[in-house]
Design a protein with these regions (language model features):
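Glycine-rich "HGGG/HGxG" loop immediately N-terminal to the catalytic nucleophile
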Residues: 66-82
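Short glycine-enriched nucleophile-adjacent loop
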Residues: 111, 116-127, 132
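Alpha/beta-hydrolase active-site loop
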Residues: 80-101
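N-terminal cap/lid segment of alpha/beta-hydrolase-fold proteins
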Residues: 1-30, 256
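Active-site nucleophile loop of the alpha/beta-hydrolase fold
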Residues: 112-114, 133-144
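Alpha/beta-hydrolase fold nucleophile elbow
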Residues: 98-113
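Serine-hydrolase catalytic core
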Residues: 8-9, 50-52, 151-284
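Short, surface-exposed "cap/lid" segments of acyl-processing enzymes
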Residues: 11, 21-67
Length: 285
């Protein structure tokens, strides 16, 4: 295994680790890009990105895991771009660097939780993206989800008791404390594209030949709750065109070693299955 530091981007402000196999790499293999998960560095939760990078490198896929600008070891990017715009610029800087230095032509981008925004944004912006994986990405409630969600709560005495306690506790809060709780909700809430917009964007990517995998854990019990929900929540015909993986026993960050190892194998296996040879992409309309 060969791992080395890469410094690149505007004013050489971005820092990452490139992982490759000591053996001759598959010249047709796309390069995999991994970035931050929330505020965590390029290591990923529980070092999952380190494990995935080494697992994929052993199969001939080069992997760059790097910190987006202003995070980890990467400098703040100057200019007036928004956070999402900066993330796309950072990802494209990584692709440009790997293309110039190593001849990389195609890429698979993986976004975990809020990292989905960067992966999805650069997939739309850059035709060099051949594959995209969301882990705990965009999710929307469906009618089936709501029926299941409400039935579980209506039939649970424990949940009724907890609800009663929470309401009593809230009544004891001052107006300022209640306002503070509302502000915290806003801070930790992400803006999702509408279902209709996301559906059109996915159609655009699929038309271009981009392979897509969406992974969800069972931890999101307020939005996503069953296998196949992806295909019911989107106003488009994506079954058989987008791959979905639902892991009901895992938590949001796949914290336990067995769940993390299983996810690494599932992601690596999907990439091996879909990108054993050079991807064919359509750049026209």
């Amino acid at each position: 295994m060969n791992e080395r530091v890469e410094v690149f981007g505007a004013r050489r402000g971005l820092t990452g680790i490139l992982t490759e196999s000591d053996a001759a790499a598959n010249a047709n293999a796309p390069t995999i890009l991994l970035t931050n998960v929330g505020i965590q560095t390029r290591v990923g939760p529980g070092r999952i990105w380190v494990e995935l990078a080494r697992r994929l490198a052993a199969s001939g896929f080069p992997v760059l895991r790097f910190d987006l600008s202003g995070m980890g070891d990467s400098a703040v990017r100057s200019g007036g771009a928004s956070e999402s715009e900066r993330a796309v610029l950072d990802m494209r800087d990584a692709m440009d660097h790997l293309g110039r230095k190593y001849g990389a032509k195609h890429f698979v981008v993986i976004g975990f939780c809020s990292g989905t925004d960067a992966a999805h944004g650069v997939a739309l912006a850059d035709p060099r993206v051949a594959g995209m994986i969301w882990v705990e990405g965009y999710a929307y409630r469906t009618r089936r989800f709501l029926v299941r969600w409400h039935m579980k709560r209506l039939l649970s005495l424990h949940r009724w008791r907890r609800y009663a306690r929470s309401q009593l506790a809230r009544l004891r809060l001052t107006a300022g404390q209640r306002r503070s709780l509302g502000e915290e909700d806003l801070i930790f809430t992400r803006d999702y594209p509408t279902r209709e917009l996301l559906s059109r964007q996915l159609e655009e990517l699929l038309h271009r030949g981009v392979r897509i995998l969406a992974v969800y854990s069972g931890a999101d019990n307020i939005t996503y709750g069953y296998s196949g929900q992806f295909f019911e929540m989107m106003p488009g015909a994506f079954r058989g065109r987008v791959d979905e993986l639902f892991v009901p026993e895992a938590d949001h960050l796949f914290t336990t070693p067995e769940h993390r190892r299983a996810l690494v194998e599932q992601l690596a296996g999907w990439i091996e299955d879909r990108f054993g040879e050079r991807p064919t992409l359509r750049t026209g309309t």
